[in-house]
């Protein structure tokens, strides 16, 4: 069994308002090993993305990580200063966002942006950095990488922009990549290509992956293990085949049963009864 890379214990993230603190993430425990792909699954509002942002220290006011440990390679990230976290982000831990335009500056050429991701963390000649950028674009399947380094983001399709975002995340060979629904807005064909590339890259470099999604089909295809989130908590986790083939928690069963593939043609789609609790309904003693 591979070494533990990320060990999260009792993570709680709250958003402060005049009425008090409201828990978006409420006691999350999560372990990720080197080279492992973990799917973090749940419906909108379950706390998936807030968990991902919390791990990287990217929660802005009025949000705050109020409790828990986030141990990366044995070091508690919550005890690091902002400069130490800045050196970690994009270097040892990278993140890929749902919208690649959150990663890419529209007025800078792709090559400039990619080279900056290297030069921020390493003192290498610019020509060497650009060669690594070219190789990264080639790795994610972008044709004519030399030409594309001189292109602007608007000259790429949505799928190609997402490939660029993946290439940027891989530039410094991080130990962990957090992916926040990076294929949600893409068509099925492009989604399949990107999933294949991500699996290939992770296996080659022994990179661990946290794949945040609401799509159980993607998790079944991509992940080694899955953690199911509901109302800010992980309610079930385990090897992906075990959880999807024999779910033990009612919410996990409800998610699986509501998939179109589980419904006969012409039959009414099944849905989970009731509604997920709001922040106010699940408010606890978070401070």
Q: Where are these predicted regions, by residue range?
A:
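P-loop NTP-binding/switch modules centered on Walker-like glycine-rich loops
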Residues: 43, 178, 186, 190-268
